[in-house]
């Protein structure tokens, strides 16, 4: 396919046009007085949002070179959202400012490579200052404040997230779901829950709820398929003598083995329930091992020389209770030793920190939460589907931001941290062009505060100058349009969010400034001729 090649300034100017289109649409959402953006949907009602990354993701431009620029800045907001969960609009505003000022210098004949080095030197120095300024976020009150800010000043959401973190610890899993009422509610699930249900409805003990409830059960953990009942007989006899129920968690249970378990259950000989082990492959083995640690049992695996015929009661795990539904199973209050559980948590935490795969990291965090704290579910209520979607976006953002705050601490919000950090930076470039790059980056750090003020209908320069004349955490509270101590007023940002926004913005802005050529596909001529043919057909139809 033929390509359209643009070189130098021609390529960069088109990309910058695209960047400005995307950034101008996103930045209207910044701050407590930011505006909503309405997104058209192919089906159903449009979505109304104040979430920067949701706006950015919707933007696709017709001009391919403009679209390249827009997609690069979209990457800034997506990357910031993935790493820190918030700060997407801030990152976009920073990237636009660095590109805009940098392009003026490149057009004036400056070396873009040196400008880029200067920008990165400034960002590195400011990031160090932000890390020095950060205050640990450990209290329920400060966690609630972070959640409130990230949920666009919705204090109820902030409080609910703080309460969820308090109940399941900062390690626990907190999920956000659409509820069925008009009110938000927090549901805390104790113990370990996973998405596997009973293999036969004949295992159900509570017909009303359609669940199998097992009190003080033994738990048999096996990493292979169980088809032959003879393999299970020694275990069933031992459990029957003990007079306790049995929960079998294996790769699968079918055929003769499943039929015998069902018959024994119906006749009341042994109260047993069988489920498939969660996960697949290596992850299944790891999750079975987690269950073994939690319940104080042993995974019966041929890899370690254990077979079903040799199982004794002390190899079985135990819990206070187990509830098995159609699609999920919950193990409550396992009999595993606390020291063993803590050691297993430390091992999983270490794996999560060292993995490069985002998917693996997410799954490891889930496993950690199930072992360490439990699961909290925030069920959202809203009057309409449009409101529900918008609220879910906000709560997801707030949840990510509070996690980021717990990890790296908090700094003054409202763009104050960037302005304070830039005033402390004394970095020098190796030459005039690097120095100019440093100045471009430092000037861009005022931009989020200017935009917050602009969204209030105020002059950004006046606000920035007034904040720079004051000290410490004094800043501009856009909600009340007053100057306050930002940390005391609870207007705070996670340090990780501010840091990620700045680093990602500088990274993409540097790429745009150092672009020497851009290549895109030319429009297909076949498409044009096909359109012409279609037009001709229509004309003929009119003649008949």
Curated annotation (Swiss-Prot):
Keyword Cytoplasm belongs to the record: yes
Binding positions (ATP): 29-32, 50, 86-90, 414, 477-479, 493
Enzyme Commission number, as recorded: 5.6.1.7
Signal sequence residues: none
Presence of the UniProt keyword Transcription regulation in the record: no
Stored Pfam families: Cpn60_TCP1 (PF00118)
UniProt keyword terms in alphabetical order: ATP-binding, Chaperone, Cytoplasm, Isomerase, Nucleotide-binding
UniProt GO molecular function: ATP binding; ATP-dependent protein folding chaperone; isomerase activity; unfolded protein binding
Main function: Together with its co-chaperonin GroES, plays an essential role in assisting protein folding. The GroEL-GroES system forms a nano-cage that allows encapsulation of the non-native substrate proteins and provides a physical environment optimized to promote and accelerate protein folding.
Family per similarity comment: Belongs to the chaperonin (HSP60) family.
Subunit structure, interactors included: Forms a cylinder of 14 subunits composed of two heptameric rings stacked back-to-back. Interacts with the co-chaperonin GroES.
PANTHER family per UniProt: 60 KDA HEAT SHOCK PROTEIN, MITOCHONDRIAL
Protein name in UniProt: Chaperonin GroEL
Name of the gene this protein is made from: groEL
């Amino acid at each position: 396919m033929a390509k359209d090649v643009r070189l130098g300034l021609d390529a960069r100017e088109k990309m910058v046009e695209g960047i400005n289109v995307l950034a101008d649409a996103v930045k209207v959402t910044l701050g407590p007085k930011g505006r909503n953006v309405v997104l058209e949907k192919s089906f159903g009602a449009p979505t109304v949002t104040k979430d920067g990354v949701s706006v950015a993701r919707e933007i696709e431009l017709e001009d391919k070179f403009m679209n390249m620029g827009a997609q690069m800045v979209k990457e800034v907001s997506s990357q910031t959202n993935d790493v820190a969960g918030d700060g997407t609009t801030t990152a976009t505003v920073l990237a636009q400012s660095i590109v805009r000022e940098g392009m003026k210098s490149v057009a004036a004949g400056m070396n873009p490579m040196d400008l880029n080095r200067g920008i990165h030197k400034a960002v590195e120095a400011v990031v160090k200052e932000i890390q020095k300024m950060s205050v640990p976020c450990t209290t329920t009150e400060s966690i609630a404040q972070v959640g409130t800010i990230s949920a666009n000043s919705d204090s109820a959401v902030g409080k609910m997230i703080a309460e969820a973190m308090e109940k399941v610890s900062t390690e626990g899993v907190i999920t956000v779901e659409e509820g069925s009422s008009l009110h938000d509610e927090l549901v805390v699930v104790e113990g370990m829950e996973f998405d596997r249900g009973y293999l036969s409805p004949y295992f159900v003990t509570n017909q009303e709820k359609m669940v199998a409830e097992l009190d003080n059960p033994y738990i048999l953990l096996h990493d292979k398929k169980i088809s032959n009942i003879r393999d299970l007989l020694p275990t069933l006899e031992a459990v029957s003598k003990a007079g306790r129920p049995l929960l079998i968690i294996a790769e699968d249970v079918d055929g003769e083995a499943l039929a015998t378990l069902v018959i024994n259950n119906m006749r009341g000989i042994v109260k047993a329930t069988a489920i498939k082990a969660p996960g697949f492959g290596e992850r299944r083995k790891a999750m079975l091992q987690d269950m073994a640690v939690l319940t104080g049992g042993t995974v019966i695996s041929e890899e370690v020389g254990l077979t079903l015929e040799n199982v004794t009661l002390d190899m079985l795990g135990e819990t206070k209770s187990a509830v098995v539904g159609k699609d999920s199973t919950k193990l409550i209050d396992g009999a595993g030793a606390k020291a063993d559980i803590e050691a297993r948590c430390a091992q999983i935490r270490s794996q999560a920190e060292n993995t490069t795969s985002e998917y693996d990291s997410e799954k490891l965090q889930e496993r950690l939460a199930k072992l360490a704290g439990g699961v909290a579910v925030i069920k959202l209520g809203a009057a309409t589907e449009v409101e529900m979607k918008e609220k879910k976006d906000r709560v997801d953002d707030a949840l990510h931001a509070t996690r980021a705050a717990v990890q790296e601490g908090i700094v003054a919000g409202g763009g104050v941290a960037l302005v304070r950090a830039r005033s402390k930076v004394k970095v020098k470039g190796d030459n005039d062009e690097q120095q100019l790059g440093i100045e471009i980056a430092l000037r861009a750090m005022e931009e989020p505060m200017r935009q917050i003020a602009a969204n209030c209908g105020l002059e950004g320069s006046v606000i920035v100058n007034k904040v720079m004349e004051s000290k410490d955490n004094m800043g501009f509270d856009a909600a009340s349009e007053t100057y306050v101590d930002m940390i005391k007023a609870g207007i705070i940002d996670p340090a990780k969010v501010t840091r990620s926004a700045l680093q990602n913005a500088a990274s993409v802005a540097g790429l745009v400034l150092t672009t020497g050529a851009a290549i895109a596909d030319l429009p297909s001529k076949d498409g044009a001729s096909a359109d012409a043919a279609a037009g001709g057909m229509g004309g003929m139809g009119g003649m008949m």
